[in-house]
Amino acid sequence: MWFNSVKDTKMKKNLKKWVLLLVAAIALPVTTMAQEKKVELGVNLDVTMDVVSSYIWRGQKLGNACLQTTVGVAYKGFSLSAWSPIVFDGNDNDEIDLTLAYETGNFSVSLTDYWMTEIGDEHTLEAQLGYDFGVVGVNWYTNVYGDDKEYASYISLIAPFSLIGLDWEAEVGATPWGTDYYGTDKFSVCDLSLGASKEFNIGSWFSTTLFAKATYNPTAEKFYGTVGISF
């Protein structure tokens, strides 16, 4: 009975992920053709599909090569999006991230539901506060609900710049206190990253972006390299 219950749950979760992918596949050509013509009501539909060589998140490797799909809708600063990876080697962690966000000026706030069936509680809610100072963007994240009882937090500083025709991002990420969620026992820098990207326009209605990123986790003493393409 327990095995059947787990199997049914995973089947339902996988179905939801494939439905998300199908919606993205259908909506992608619609959104690309409508990029030059804004919807009069001010509602914007955003669909992206990234193929990446590995799934790296905040200095941790969570998976191998995968397709990462995002479907979102935005209206007057508010946005709602769904994100999910489909790992090519079949070692899927059954993840769907649902994010409700609001942006005004340089300030942003959001609440993300990390929905994973294989890690304790299926849902972990994370609150985010951020401010973009121009030369650097600062974001603070804290788990406010779920299996994590330590209010695991993470702070990220991202500095964007342009050089030799590429768009770059330098990032520093750290945990302000120890938590099993990030595998740290004190204040720890766990993400030193440098990424570059280049957008290519194909005609007047479609564009794609190639990107690469190098990540070093000083706490775990691990290095990761990622390349990918975004549609």
Give, region by region, the residue ranges found by the protein language model.
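Short loop/turn motifs that connect adjacent beta-strands in outer-membrane beta-barrel proteins
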Residues: 35-44, 106, 135, 160-169, ...
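Cleavable N-terminal export/targeting peptides
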Residues: 1-44
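Solvent-exposed loop/turn segments connecting transmembrane beta-strands
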Residues: 57-65, 86-95, 115-124, 143-153, ...
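Transmembrane beta-strands of outer-membrane beta-barrel proteins
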Residues: 46-52, 72, 81-85, 101, ...
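Outer-membrane beta-barrel "beta-signal"
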Residues: 194, 200, 218-231
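Gram-negative (and chloroplast) outer-membrane scaffold detector with strong preference
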Residues: 97-146, 156-161
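Outer membrane beta-barrel transmembrane domains
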Residues: 167-202
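Short glycine/proline- and aromatic-enriched beta-strand/turn motifs that initiate or cap beta-hairpins
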Residues: 35-88
